[in-house]
Amino acid sequence: MTFAKITQAAHYVPENVVSNDDLSKIMDTNDEWIYSRTGIKNRHISTGENTSDLATKVAKQLIENSGVDPELIDFIIVATVTPDSMMPSTAARVQAQVGATNAFAYDLTAACSGFVFALSTAEKLISSGAYQRGIVIGAEVFSKVIDWSDRSTAVLFGDGAAGVLLDNSGSQPLIIAEKMQTDGKRGGSLLSSYADIQTPFASVSYEGSNLSMEGRAIFDFAVRDVPKNIQATLEKSDLAAEEIDYYLLHQANSRILDKMAKKLGVTRDKFLQNMQEYGNTSAASIPILLSESVKNGIFSLDGQTKVVLTGFGGGLTWGTAIINL
């Protein structure tokens, strides 16, 4: 059988760091208010780099660190809800910049679950035997869709990108078990870049494009539905929660992680966290955490670590993949 394997991980964030104190100068908030409610201290905000710029820097790191000829890459998937444009896709822009001339490339839109959904897709492409090598990236420039006068959302988000290189060199299944979910009926709880039909044949008013969020509804969704998803995936894997080495969850809010750990009966230190430095980077949050963990020696990519990856956010979407890293 053919098994996919993650062989490289990389991340990139803009150099510009915006602290809670910086935000207090442009809106009615302060460090204590933000940190006590979210666990966030800083976020990296682009001063000109767009989503494809961040994603390209990640892809170049993956290629350079692996020594792989970019022409041998079969596909590039970019998970994002903040693309440079609808056409061409962010992935197509990345493909051009790195010289992956033989790769097909497309964007996947699943908000904060995007990286997990994209990794699931990539694993199937490789394990089917149809493709040998691919790149999966989560990349966001949320600063361009934020209403910077709205402290309820502006304090939460940051910009960044991260990703992995996969190939067919695995000796065991990459994904042990997975469960992906969507509930479009609750999609209105988290909206971004909403555009009405505007043509000479329709009389519909424009409703704006800034991100809007029903904070309480999203928090309740995260602490109610997501632990059930993780537990269901664990049951499919025949693994107990304590047998997982690390939990890499979407970095939305530290209080959400506290509640997740308690509901699953897992010690909080297994839930890795870096939101204090990056904020919520949507589709980029899980791969940034993964890449940083490898860089800092928390775990390596030797296939010996069992990790839960769980995303949850707009759509509403949520999903878990238990993987062998």
Swiss-Prot record:
One of its GO terms (cellular component) is cytoplasm. CDD domains: KAS_III. GO terms for molecular function: 3-oxoacyl-[acyl-carrier-protein] synthase activity; beta-ketoacyl-acyl-carrier-protein synthase III activity. GO terms for biological process: fatty acid biosynthetic process. The active site is at C112, H250, N280. It is an enzyme of class 2 (transferase). It catalyses: malonyl-[ACP] + acetyl-CoA + H(+) = 3-oxobutanoyl-[ACP] + CO2 + CoA. It is found in: Cytoplasm. InterPro entries: ACP_syn_III_C, ACP_syn_III_N, FabH, Thiolase-like. Residues 251-255 are annotated as: ACP-binding. It comes from the Bacteria. Gene3D superfamilies: 3.40.47.10. Its EC number is 2.3.1.180. Keywords: Acyltransferase, Cytoplasm, Fatty acid biosynthesis, Fatty acid metabolism, Lipid biosynthesis, Lipid metabolism, Multifunctional enzyme, Transferase. Pathway: Lipid metabolism; fatty acid biosynthesis. The last Arg residue of the ACP-binding site is essential for the weak association between ACP/AcpP and FabH. Catalyzes the condensation reaction of fatty acid synthesis by the addition to an acyl acceptor of two carbons from malonyl-ACP. Catalyzes the first condensation reaction which initiates fatty acid synthesis and may therefore play a role in governing the total rate of fatty acid production. Possesses both acetoacetyl-ACP synthase and acetyl transacylase activities. Its substrate specificity determines the biosynthesis of branched-chain and/or straight-chain of fatty acids. Homodimer. This is Beta-ketoacyl-[acyl-carrier-protein] synthase III. It comes from Lactococcus lactis subsp. cremoris (strain MG1363).
